[in-house]
Amino acid sequence: MQYLTILGSTGSIGRSTLDIVRRHPDRFAVTALTANQGVAQMMSDCLEFHPSYAVMADEASAIALKEALAGHKLKTEVLTGTDALCQVAAHSSVDIVMAAIVGAAGLLPAMAAIKKGKTVLLANKEALVMSGRLFMDAAHHYSARILPVDSEHNAIFQCLPAEAQSALGNCDLSAAGVDKILLTGSGGPFRYTSLSQLSSVTPEQAVAHPNWSMGRKISVDSATMMNKGLEFIEAKWLFNATEEQIQVIIHPQSVIHSMVQYRDGSVLAQMGQPDMRTPIAHALGFPERVASGVSPLDFSRVGELSFLPVDFERYPCLKLAIEACWAGQGATTALNAANEIAVDAFLSGKIGFTQIHTVVLDVLSELKQANINDLESILAIDAEARLMAHQKITRLAV
């Protein structure tokens, strides 16, 4: 039996993870569930999975959950705050931690799990975007195992030889015969929208992804392709890739989730339905394969698979992310922080869709880069970039 902490259990990845757990009660049990404010969903999950701990990041939500559970004969202890998130991520009874908290808030609990040598199923992009080198070095130092859950990185992982899989963060792609990682992206809902119309895109249009079911923030990131930019940065750290070893390509159908091109001309691709239960099941069961509930591809119905080069005029946020990737961890931390604030402002109707790029660009242009050698430095840059982004949004909204 493998015992799990699910960080972000009420979100899209968390729901899919619990679906896999539900299908394999003989293999997986839940020690802890965490969420921000989703009291009703958390209560339902506590009644079904009987976790030892339920953590609500929001204190008022924790109080509400405790009151809601009071009438039930559960031994679930309700906790709140960042320290509690780190506590359940590092708990001695936990074998696997699903790191699925969206945003910078997921960094500290993911690092807490790493420092206790856990198997970390990494769905939180920001852990690597903000602290890639520190995070991978810590995983090596504490003998923690990282398994990528993002569909693209999980696909790349599956297409790599065993020696590269076992040395994430330090693998030598060239020695493994790899020429290039091909990171695929659908291009989002505005792939064919005229550039002149992008400034008038609404939040409702931006969150309507053509292929994937995702949360609102990640859906907007997919529309700007900032999501692919963050994945580009992740790929650099996970697979120890050089600038010449990663390429982004548009693949509208989202059937091929990414590819690895080898020196001999071979290209290995991982294919499947656009359903996150597939990479989650792969990571949970690794190195074995477990049922995910996802129906296999019917190749008689797949039809055309097409590929397009990236148009950086259409996706300037992706260009910013790639540039930040090679500028250093200070730049990627600032990029991520400014983007989180800008996307939230867009979803709240404070700025337009194309102004997300404007805010992020302005923050990156003005923020003084500092040496990054510890988490405190990263969090300081994160805070400064968020403040600057708020200030720029205030000026844009006037």
UniProtKB/Swiss-Prot annotation:
Cited InterPro entries: DXP_reductoisomerase, DXP_reductoisomerase_C, DXP_reductoisomerase_N, DXPR_C, DXPR_C_sf, NAD(P)-bd_dom_sf
EC number: 1.1.1.267
Residues at which Mn(2+) binds: 150, 152, 231
Catalytic activity: 2-C-methyl-D-erythritol 4-phosphate + NADP(+) = 1-deoxy-D-xylulose 5-phosphate + NADPH + H(+)
Signal peptide: none
One GO-annotated biological process of the protein: isopentenyl diphosphate biosynthetic process, methylerythritol 4-phosphate pathway involved in terpenoid biosynthetic process
Pathway connected to this protein: Isoprenoid biosynthesis; isopentenyl diphosphate biosynthesis via DXP pathway; isopentenyl diphosphate from 1-deoxy-D-xylulose 5-phosphate: step 1/6
Cofactor: Mg(2+); Mn(2+)
GO MF, one example: manganese ion binding
Gene3D superfamilies according to UniProt: 1.10.1740.10, NAD(P)-binding Rossmann-like Domain
Keywords: Isoprene biosynthesis, Manganese, Metal-binding, NADP, Oxidoreductase
Residues that bind 1-deoxy-D-xylulose 5-phosphate: 125, 151-152, 186, 209, 222, 227-228, 231
Pfam families: DXP_redisom_C, DXP_reductoisom, DXPR_C
Stated role: Catalyzes the NADPH-dependent rearrangement and reduction of 1-deoxy-D-xylulose-5-phosphate (DXP) to 2-C-methyl-D-erythritol 4-phosphate (MEP).
Protein name as catalogued: 1-deoxy-D-xylulose 5-phosphate reductoisomerase
Originating organism: Tolumonas auensis (strain DSM 9187 / NBRC 110442 / TA 4)
Primary gene name: dxr
